Amino acid sequence: MSIFRKKKGAEGEYLACRFLKKQGYVILQKNYRKKYGEIDIIAQEGGDLVFVEVKTRSNSDWGSPVAAVTKQKQRKIIRVAQTYLAETELFDEAIRFDVIGIILDENSPPIFELIHNAFELEKFNGIF
């Protein structure tokens, strides 16, 4: 991954945290990594533990950033989330998976698209 893309991604994650805080989320952890994947943001919102994937783009020429969260990426996020739940012993928490897309065009303010419950754990049960 190029330095430009890493920098753009880090900027997107920073802006996503600010945006989510304004929406009432409490950020618990950023960049939770395991050898098989990463969760960008883990937060609490209402009574839910929320695993958030952040996708940042320079423009929408290739479509919405949230559309880049493929089924394969969803599986990785779910696998990492299951590890997080096991490590923290938060098995009884209500959880959900949100995706936030950010368009960072240098000529205009950032555009945010937040999708609550973007995908569900039940759809992938038994695949690991």
Curated annotation (Swiss-Prot):
InterPro entries linked to this entry: Restrct_endonuc-II-like, tRNA_endonuc-like_dom_sf, UPF0102_YraN-like
MF term (GO), any: nucleic acid binding
Record-linked SUPFAM superfamilies: Restriction endonuclease-like
N-terminal signal peptide: none
Pfam families the record matches: UPF0102
Gene3D superfamilies for the chain: 3.40.1350.10
HAMAP family found in the cross-reference section: UPF0102
Family: Belongs to the UPF0102 family.
Protein's recorded name: UPF0102 protein DP2807
